[in-house]
């Protein structure tokens, strides 16, 4: 995972792979982390899309980094606020 990627493959607990589209990535200085918001590509246009979030650390050579779970309520609140701002800006366009 690195900034600017458009698709990522998520592997669930059972080892199933799911291709997802990256909505956007951002960095947060408060938590000193990078975050990615994404959703499954196979979601239908008329279905409500479930957006997922993870933190990630790009590796040193700029290739795929490791996704990590969001750990605190404070992080979730910050992510929700960032997502709401993003969606509001998209609606204005």
From Swiss-Prot:
InterPro entries hit by this protein: UPF0473
Top-level division of the source organism's lineage: Bacteria
Pfam families in UniProt: DUF1292 (PF06949)
UniProt family annotation: Belongs to the UPF0473 family.
Protein name (record): UPF0473 protein RBAM_024480
Lineage per the UniProt record: Bacteria, Bacillati, Bacillota, Bacilli, Bacillales
